[in-house]
């Protein structure tokens, strides 16, 4: 038994238990009618069981956010809720340094993260519906039903995705109540995800056992060659990816069973956006026995994560629901330094560890680096792709080795530990990016000046 338990950390075993329990619960909830309020109550009960009195952290921001939504000026509500929610998130993370309270960590932090996304998301959903309520021919779907206070709490604590993601909108939760989904069979969708587990779980367990993260924290990493350090970083990244591949295979299956993110395939659904072909959706939403798609809830595009040509495509394929949340509510709404601001918000959302800011800060520079390099080596007009030699060279040097380095910063978290390992590989990625970042900043200023003239 000890050997089996030793294959994963205590937190990993708890997450595994939560996912398996949630999977079983989703089957039962679907059977009894897929009630949103009951699912919210179940999620709250699970949270209370796992984190106990620490649940007051999430209850606090839920109550504050709803109060702002009720009392603030409608036009300014999204901004107030966004700033308040992130300020609160930072406060509770540092509260244990100044107050006699428990630290927000592990499962408590994950619940706080997911609820943060849901609070801000539903605020923007309500506001966008209010702004566009008089549109005669809307080009996108807006919230079709305004939630009550109780329904908001049920959404915030809905057990589906509460401990691992993916993020989904309140409108997607409403859409899951579509009566035709009761007769739709999710077996094939679930089966395809469980096939993934047949390879992702064994790879995770084996690599996690033989290549522990603590090696990067030890002085032993300095006793091996530079090449070996890069190989070890690559293996740590495999551990990280396969853990996530496995967890989200089950998490997506739970969504699918409950009908969250399931739409007619002809309506061209997109991640957390839902159907984008509104005419097709209106025609097909009440029809049975048609092809359905789960694209709106697919949180990973594994082929692109593994084989895309660049940083941008790789990042977009990873944790797609959060990436889209950031694109909708941060990137598209700020006027300057969009990539940098988006990465800053992403780092703050993940936590206060220096490793998050170091990794996401370098990601922003990597995007600029890639833009400059891709301009220097343009796409061939005949083939539609860049030269093969370049794709092989770029993918297997900057792109892959870069993602692996960034992953170590994300996982090591502590500034000392990140520096300990990154210095052993000579900070090669940031040092490579900085000149390109400065170059890009300089050449962009004249263009902005010309536009203003």
Swiss-Prot record:
Pathway: Lipid metabolism; phospholipid metabolism. It comes from the Eukaryota. GO terms for molecular function: lysophospholipid acyltransferase activity; O-acyltransferase activity. The chain crosses the membrane at residues 4-24, 36-56, 79-99, 154-174, 195-215, 220-240, 244-264, 354-374, 421-441. Glycans are attached at residue 319. It is an enzyme of class 2 (transferase). The active site is at residue 350. Disruption phenotype: Mutants show larval arrest at an early developmental stage and egg-laying defects; 14% of mutants accumulate unlaid eggs that hatched internally. Its EC number is 2.3.1.-. The keyword Nuclease does not apply. It is a multi-pass membrane protein. It catalyses: 1-octadecanoyl-sn-glycero-3-phospho-(1D-myo-inositol) + (5Z,8Z,11Z,14Z,17Z)-eicosapentaenoyl-CoA = 1-octadecanoyl-2-(5Z,8Z,11Z,14Z,17Z-eicosapentaenoyl)-sn-glycero-3-phospho-(1D-myo-inositol) + CoA; a 1-acyl-sn-glycero-3-phospho-(1D-myo-inositol) + (5Z,8Z,11Z,14Z,17Z)-eicosapentaenoyl-CoA = a 1-acyl-2-(5Z,8Z,11Z,14Z,17Z-eicosapentaenoyl)-sn-glycero-3-phospho-(1D-myo-inositol) + CoA; a 1-acyl-sn-glycero-3-phospho-(1D-myo-inositol) + (5Z,8Z,11Z,14Z)-eicosatetraenoyl-CoA = a 1-acyl-2-(5Z,8Z,11Z,14Z-eicosatetraenoyl)-sn-glycero-3-phospho-(1D-myo-inositol) + CoA. GO terms for cellular component: intracellular membrane-bounded organelle; membrane; mitochondria-associated endoplasmic reticulum membrane contact site. Pfam families: MBOAT. It is found in: Membrane. Expressed ubiquitously throughout development from early embryo to larval and adult stages. In adults, strongly expressed in pharyngeal muscle, body wall muscle, vulval cells, distal tip cells, intestinal cells and spermatheca. Keywords: Acyltransferase, Glycoprotein, Lipid biosynthesis, Lipid metabolism, Membrane, Phospholipid biosynthesis, Phospholipid metabolism, Transferase, Transmembrane, Transmembrane helix. GO terms for biological process: egg-laying behavior; lipid modification; multicellular organism growth; nematode larval development; phosphatidylinositol biosynthetic process. Acyltransferase which mediates the conversion of lysophosphatidylinositol (1-acyl-sn-glycero-3-phosphatidylinositol or LPI) into phosphatidylinositol (1,2-diacyl-sn-glycero-3-phosphoinositol or PI) (LPIAT activity). Prefers sn-2-LPI rather than sn-1-LPI as the acyl acceptor. Lysophospholipid acyltransferases (LPLATs) catalyze the reacylation step of the phospholipid remodeling pathway also known as the Lands cycle. Involved in the selective incorporation of arachidonoyl-CoA ((5Z,8Z,11Z,14Z)-eicosatetraenoyl-CoA) and (5Z,8Z,11Z,14Z,17Z)-eicosapentaenoyl-CoA (EPA-CoA) into PI. Belongs to the membrane-bound acyltransferase family. This is Membrane-bound acylglycerophosphatidylinositol O-acyltransferase mboa-7.
């Amino acid at each position: 038994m000890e050997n089996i338990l030793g294959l994963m950390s205590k937190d990993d075993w708890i997450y595994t238990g939560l996912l398996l329990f949630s999977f079983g619960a989703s089957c039962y909830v679907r059977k009894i009618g897929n009630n949103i309020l009951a699912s919210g109550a179940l999620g709250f009960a699970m949270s209370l069981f796992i984190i106990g009195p620490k649940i007051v952290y999430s209850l606090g921001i839920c109550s504050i956010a709803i109060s702002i939504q009720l009392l603030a000026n409608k036009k300014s509500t999204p901004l107030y809720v966004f700033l308040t929610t992130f300020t609160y998130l930072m406060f509770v993370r540092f509260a244990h340094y100044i107050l006699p309270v428990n630290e927000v960590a592990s499962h408590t932090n994950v619940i706080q993260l997911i609820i943060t996304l849901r609070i801000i998301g539903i605020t923007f959903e309500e506001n966008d519906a209010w702004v566009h309520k008089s549109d005669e021919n809307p080009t996108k779907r807006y919230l079709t039903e305004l939630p009550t206070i109780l329904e908001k709490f049920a959404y915030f604590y809905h057990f589906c995705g509460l401990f691992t993601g993916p993020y989904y909108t309140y409108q997607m939760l409403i859409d899951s109540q579509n009566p035709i989904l009761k007769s739709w069979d999710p077996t094939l969708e679930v089966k395809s995800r469980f096939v993934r587990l047949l390879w992702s779980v064994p790879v995770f367990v084996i690599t996690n056992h033989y290549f522990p993260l603590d090696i990067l924290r030890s002085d032993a990493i300095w006793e091996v060659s530079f090449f070996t350090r890069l190989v070890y970083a690559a293996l740590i990244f495999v551990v990280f990816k396969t853990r996530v591949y496995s967890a989200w295979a089950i998490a997506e299956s739970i969504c699918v069973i409950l009908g969250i993110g399931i739409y007619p395939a002809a309506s061209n659904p997109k991640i957390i956006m839902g159907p984008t072909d509104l005419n097709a959706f209106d025609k097909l939403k009440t029809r049975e026995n048609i092809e359905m798609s789960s694209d709106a809830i697919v949180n990973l595009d594994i082929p692109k994560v593994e084989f895309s040509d660049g940083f941008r495509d790789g990042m977009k394929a990873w944790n797609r629901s959060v990436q889209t949340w950031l694109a909708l509510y941060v990137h598209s709404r700020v006027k300057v330094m969009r990539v940098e601001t988006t990465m800053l918000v992403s780092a703050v959302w993940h936590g206060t560890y220096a490793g998050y800011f170091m990794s996401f800060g370098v990601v922003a520079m990597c995007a600029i680096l890639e833009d400059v390099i891709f301009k220097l080596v343009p796409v061939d007009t005949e083939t539609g792709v860049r030269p093969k030699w370049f794709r092989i060279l770029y993918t297997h040097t900057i792109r892959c080795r870069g993602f692996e380095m960034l992953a170590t910063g994300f996982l090591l978290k502590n500034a000392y530990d990140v520096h300990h390992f990154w210095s052993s590989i000579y900070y090669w990625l940031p040092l490579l990016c900085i000149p390109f970042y400065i170059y890009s900043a300089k050449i962009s200023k004249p263009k902005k000046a010309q536009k203003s003239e």
